[in-house]
Amino acid sequence: MRRSFHRMFVRVPLLVAFVGAAVVGCGTPDARPANEAGTVTLRLGYFPNVTHAQPIIGLADGTFARELGSDVKLEAKTFNAGPSVIEALFAGAIDASYIGPNPAVAGYVQSGGKDVRIIAGATSGGALLIVKADSGITKAADFSGKRIATPQLGNTQDVAARAWLRQNGLRDRDHGGTVDVRPIANADALALFIKGELQAAWAPEPWATRLILEGNGKTFLDERDVWPGGDFVTTHLIVSAKFLAEHPDTVEKLLRAHVKTTQWINGNPDQAKQIVNAGIRQATGAALPEAVINGAWRNQKTTYDPVASSLRKSADDAFALGYLGDKKPDLSGMYALDPLNRVLKELGLKEVSK
């Protein structure tokens, strides 16, 4: 029976927040398909936005092609939404992709833990609580009776907003409180914010910066300030479990390209921003204004660490909000970090943990 990811995504919206404990490794030799060229085809998905810097840059400068080598045929595909990525992965149309945590976890759960593996992180941070400059909001208690937008019911920012309200003695109306939390698509939230119909928004980049620059907003809280070390996951690199099992050497080559590109980005931020914005323009027809990409870049961190601990904390928040039902699902096999740690060890870098 064909999976319906979109139904799953609505039914279990908060599963982004919960991550299990076990790390899955794979050590079998790379199995090459018997095609006439003797090559492996790797179909890689990504989004043309600022939180997907590694594929945009690594594809543009040839790092991915060089590290994969002549025996791997790389096909890149762009997407605009996480559910579409998971549908493509389920259908066998892609093998790996950069993606946000919510659809990755939901896909893992729907497949019964069989199809999706997180093999690296890509971006941390990049979410802020923005308030209208003239809203009169200066402290947490001032949010009582106000309207706050989040991108989607149960997504990462939605959970963070509702949990933060609880930590500050408030509750959203859905849970018997006085704060009106409204899940609204980012573009629509920006329009309503500009009109003054919203007093606040817990938003990801580049939307947070746009709320400030276009909507007379100001930062009330940078979400990094509520996480240990300021790190929480925004973007992952995932791979199909089947591809990982059949082509572990190819996955390690991809991870080597990912890590090297991450290092280059962090060492050359100004150049990296320009390349990312050029990639966004090529894919979408419009680059981000310089002030927007500069602001968004400051508020996020490019990394290969999946920051798994941040998902465990979010899981506790999601469960407390009642979004995970009476029993937390078993996500114990979702992470496959052994290949990444082998690459990190080879490059003399600190290994990441689950």
Regions found by a protein language model. Give the residues of each.
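Pocket-lining segment of extracytoplasmic ligand-binding domains
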Residues: 135, 175-178, 182, 188-280
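Short, solvent-exposed loop/beta-turn-alpha elements that line the ligand-binding surface or hinge
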Residues: 63-72, 225-230, 298-306
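Conserved C-terminal helix/tail region of periplasmic/extracytoplasmic solute-binding proteins
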Residues: 316-354
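Secondary-structure end/capping motifs
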Residues: 245-326
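Short, glycine-/small- and polar/acidic-enriched structural segments
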Residues: 32-183, 199-205, 216
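Soluble non-cytosolic domains of exported or imported proteins
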Residues: 79-83, 151-159, 187, 202, ...
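Short, low-complexity disordered leader/linker segments with a strong preference
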Residues: 1-41, 349-354
